[in-house]
Structures are given as C-alpha cells and as structure tokens.
Amino acid sequence: MGEGHGDTFEGVSTDRLKLELLEEIHMKDVVQLSTLEIRHKIAELEANLNGDLAGSEWKTRYETQLELNDQLEKQIVSLKEKMEKMRGNPSDRLSSIRVYEKMPVESLNVLLKQLEKEKRSLESQVKEYAFRLEQESKAYHRTNNERRSYIAEMTQVSGSNQVSKRQQMDPLPRMKESPVKTGRHNSMNQKTTNAKKGPVKKVPRSNHLPKLNP
C-alpha cells in the first residue's frame, strides 16, 4: 500500500470513496428490492396456479407478470454485473473513480441527486407492485369465494331436482293380492252384507220320518 498524503488514500479522496460507497449501497438496495418483488410474485402465481380457479383472466395476468419478471431479472443481472466490475480489479475501480475525480463538485452533486432520485423511483415502483399484488390477491380470493358459493348453490338445486324427479318417476308399488286373501276378503264382504240385511232366518227341520205305504 502506498503512503497516504493529506486526506487522500491511494490517490483517491475520501469524498470520492464515499460517493462510490453510496453508489454500491444504492445498487445493493435495488437488487434486494427487485429480488423480493420477484419472489413474492412467484409465490403468488404458484398459489393461483395450484388453486381451483383457472380462468382466462388469471392466465393473462400470469403471462403479463412473466414478462415483468423477465424485465426485472434482466435489471438484476445488469446491476450484478456492474457490482462485480466495481468489486473486481482494483485498478479498474480506481480508474472509474478517477472519472469522478475529474468532475467538478457541482457535477458530482447533480449525479448524487440523480442517483437518489432513481432510488426513490425504484422504491416507489416496488411499493406500487406490492399494492397491485395485494389488490389482485383480494380480487382472486373474492372471486374464488363467489365461485365456491355458486357451486354449492348449484349442487343444492341439482340435488332437489333429482329428488323431485325420482318421486315423479317411481310410484308406490302395489301389492298383488293372493287368491287366499281374495277369498277371505270376499267372505268378509259377504258377512258385512248379511249383517246389513239383518239376521238370517233358520228353516226348522222335521224330526218325523215319512210314512211308508203298506
């Protein structure tokens, strides 16, 4: 390591090092926020795909979110490459820092404000995506609950219709009467008829034998 002189280290001022550190922190925050957003959305999409509801609306949302995830992943890769370059060869890092050394303080302040503005913009986008995810999740659960309610109602109505049809198509079976039961039934009817007519008159029997002619 070379000797330090003044407020510099390896020919780099502490202000320049602070600016580099701020930029690295900014990139790290962006990567973490983007990764969190992707993981959260993947979990949401997996839950939607594993659910019972598979309509065209959710398919469209899924395809749209895949495109958004692809863009976020490209941004993450780009930011990681920049971070690797800055963490790689020290000479390259110093050369990139020397670029800032040649810039006036006013330009550095403008750059710093621009980085802070980009950070706030990215944070705002993440909040917006989180809000959209929450709204879509509520809409999904509401639609799913309505679907289950409709299915339960349809099942109940279908069961009532089946019971009604079964009652109309299946009349009560009639018992066939056997001949013995029929005879007994006729005998009972005859007794009932005689009872209505009154007591039956008995014919007196003669105890005398007929006389024989000699």
Curated annotation (Swiss-Prot):
Q: Which residues form a coiled coil?
A: 56-138
Q: Residue spans with biased composition (Polar residues)?
A: 155-166, 185-195
Source domain of life is Eukaryota
**Does Coiled coil count among this protein's keywords?**
yes
Q: Which gene encodes it?
A: Ccdc169
Name the keywords, alphabetized.
Answer: Coiled coil
Indicate the family of this protein: Belongs to the CCDC169 family.
Organism from which the protein derives:
Mus musculus
One protein family per Pfam? DUF4600
Show the segment(s) annotated as Disordered.
Answer: 154-214
User: What does the organism's lineage look like at the top?
Assistant: Eukaryota, Metazoa, Chordata, Craniata, Vertebrata
Q: What is this protein called?
A: Coiled-coil domain-containing protein 169
InterPro entries cross-referenced by the UniProt entry: DUF4600 (IPR028022)
